[in-house]
Amino acid sequence: MHLHEYQAKDLLVSYDIAIPPYRVASSVEEGQQALKELAIDAGVVKVQVHAGGRGKNGGVVVAKSPSDILAAVDKLLRMRFVSNQTSGEALPVEKVLITPLVNIAAEYYLAVIMDRKNRCPAIMLSKAGGVDIEEVAQKYPDQLLTVPLTPFARLYNYQIRQIIKFMNWEGDIRKQGAQLIKKLVQCFYDNDASLLEINPLVLTQEGDLLVLDAKITIDDNALYRHPKLEVLYDPSQENVRDVLAKQIGLSYIALDGNIGCLVNGAGLAMSTLDILKIHGGSAANFLDVGGSATEQQVQEAVSLVLSDENVEVLFINIFGGIMDCSAVASGLVAVMQTRENLIPTVVRLEGTNVDLGKDIVQRSGIPCQFTDSLNEAAQLAVALSKQG
């Protein structure tokens, strides 16, 4: 679960991490109140969306007067934000963050991440902050330092010394940096985060280390341990189908292909996506209905997949171990019989009550093609998806 910048900063403030004062506004009137509370004549106004690239895509405005700040608040709250991280979708802007300008002497990048290569949490740092870290990693890998962490939220003194030396922090900045890193690591572990990114972390001309921007992602599977974080979930920032899938308890991820997939089991679902790609096709979604879905849940899953206007072919791939193939068939038929414009459907059923399931579909008269081979089913689905 992604947090908005202001939510991430609220969390960091609770760990006594130094952040310039900020206020959040959802209207021009709230912007006026924010100006009074901050007592500033110039500042930065930033859209609050779950996407990066705000600065490059008009989502961040540097304002040099109170009237400019309010004009920026009004403008940004009216926009729908699009960047290369929104998958072509325009995200609504319901809040903006207002914060003072800072006298910056140096910018850094600092993050606590899940290092999948080494299978452990890690601190990642760079002396080049305020830029795309992916670009730095690709062009200047020597400017990045990755420090692995233990599973027990412990940061050793030698690791802190290694970081401080790499960042060239001296004097009082050494102490500030050491304390900041310890607090960020603690925050990461305490809240079951999968990402805690500070970009940029700045050194001011006054000699202070300040967090200017923060991005935090919480592990969805751990939210039951964090009810105060769970209520921060913002469904307006997600694909409508993703939100619906969560409400009905399905594991769904929207993709950009045209073959809608309904599969049981995450492993089989990923294999289905792979084999479609091998044969030149592209899935419109990942959808795992689970191992014991009911007829009602299958109906909801089919309706969810077909609600995507990009879906031109429906591919159902079920291995009925615990799952009843007849329930899958009944759920599919129930949805298809309510639709006027039916799309080609490829079905592969194996396992419990497979013959009954096939019979239910065949007697319904819906346009459906069966095959027992996963390879043949994928080839057929891809061929149908390219008929236009």
UniProtKB/Swiss-Prot annotation:
Which residues are listed for Mg(2+) binding in this entry?
Answer: N199, D213
Task: Look up the record and name the pathway of this protein.
Answer: Carbohydrate metabolism; tricarboxylic acid cycle; succinate from succinyl-CoA (ligase route): step 1/1
Q: Name one GO cellular component term.
A: succinate-CoA ligase complex
A GO term for molecular function: succinate-CoA ligase (ADP-forming) activity
Q: Which reaction does it catalyse?
A: succinate + ATP + CoA = succinyl-CoA + ADP + phosphate; GTP + succinate + CoA = succinyl-CoA + GDP + phosphate
Q: What is this protein called?
A: Succinate--CoA ligase [ADP-forming] subunit beta
Q: Which PROSITE patterns match?
A: SUCCINYL_COA_LIG_3
EC category: ligase
Record: residues binding ATP: K46, G53, R54, G55, V102, E107
At the top level of its lineage, which domain of life is listed? Bacteria
Classification lineage: Bacteria, Pseudomonadati, Chlamydiota, Chlamydiia, Chlamydiales
Instruction: Give UniProt keywords alphabetically.
Output: ATP-binding, Ligase, Magnesium, Metal-binding, Nucleotide-binding, Tricarboxylic acid cycle
- EC number from the UniProt entry: 6.2.1.5
Stated family: Belongs to the succinate/malate CoA ligase beta subunit family.
* ATP-grasp domain: residues covered: 9-244
* GO terms for biological process, alphabetical: succinyl-CoA metabolic process; tricarboxylic acid cycle
Q: Has UniProt tagged this entry with the keyword Nucleotide-binding?
A: yes
